[in-house]
């Protein structure tokens, strides 16, 4: 019996280079856009990405979660479903505020008042935008397909007004 011969492979694979080559190939051939076009009009399947907080670069646990979410979306895309691919960023105040307070060297909430509430809120928003950009690039490097130009932010006026309207309705309905 003759044994099978396999082509030699390099045992020092540059995975980062391979990753960049694959991402460049997808971009060059507009693979994601072609998939969306192919599935347009298919049965809708919606997946709301439970957002990670845009407060620091992604951790390995975020990458793991995003990879699992991507598997579900790719499966449904392969079934011909039309997907929204909407990414989100959680802008919850507490964790962002804590990091901004550290950056500014604040020791108490009184420091925030002295600094100025509006300036502090703007510093928090700037941090969210900085890290949402970083997380977007990290997610793209994972091969995570999303409509990156239409990500939602929990700090958006639309989101806040919707929450306030909902809370008002609950209050008015006495529930």
Model-derived features: where do they sit?
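N-terminal, positively charged nucleic-acid-binding surface of large information/translation enzymes
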Residues: 2-175
